[in-house]
Amino acid sequence: MPKGAAGAGPRRHIAAGLQVGSYVKVADNSGAKEAMIIGVIGYKGRLRRIPPAAVGDMVVVTVKKGTPEMRKQVVRAIVIRQRRPYRRPDGTWIAFEDNAVVIVSPDGTPKGSEIRGPVAREAAERWPKVANIASIII
């Protein structure tokens, strides 16, 4: 991946709080309200192991609730919040109230123009285009 590309930032170990089959809230104004994770981009695991996802990961989701144009679409998204607590390098623990994603294009450009609620710092550092439209970064 070229230097400075989307998602090229360092991937720190974060406790995975989501997996394939998890329902997540869509936190942008793309028209989707709720989605289900059906894949994790870049995960190469063992046979029959359910792929885990954490804050900052790009996932493949199917839209379950939203506008008629968005429903039943298979799109990519970035995890911006997770309920499962994870530890930061400075020793603090952080957990959010919900599991949320932002719908993006395959190169990491957000489909919406605003993000509702906070965005984890780990996701903002890894995906600069998501950080640009975030209102709060925690």
UniProtKB/Swiss-Prot annotation:
Coiled coil: none annotated. Keywords: Ribonucleoprotein, Ribosomal protein, RNA-binding, rRNA-binding. The keyword NADP does not apply. GO terms for biological process: translation. One of its GO terms (cellular component) is cytosolic large ribosomal subunit. Gene3D superfamilies: Ribosomal protein L14. Pfam families: Ribosomal_L14 (PF00238). The keyword Ribosomal protein applies. GO terms for molecular function: large ribosomal subunit rRNA binding; structural constituent of ribosome. Binds to 23S rRNA. Forms part of two intersubunit bridges in the 70S ribosome. NCBIfam families: PRK08571.1, uL14_arch. Belongs to the universal ribosomal protein uL14 family. PANTHER family: 50S/60S RIBOSOMAL PROTEIN L14/L23, LARGE RIBOSOMAL SUBUNIT PROTEIN UL14. Part of the 50S ribosomal subunit. Forms a cluster with proteins L3 and L24e, part of which may contact the 16S rRNA in 2 intersubunit bridges. This is Large ribosomal subunit protein uL14. It comes from Hyperthermus butylicus (strain DSM 5456 / JCM 9403 / PLM1-5).
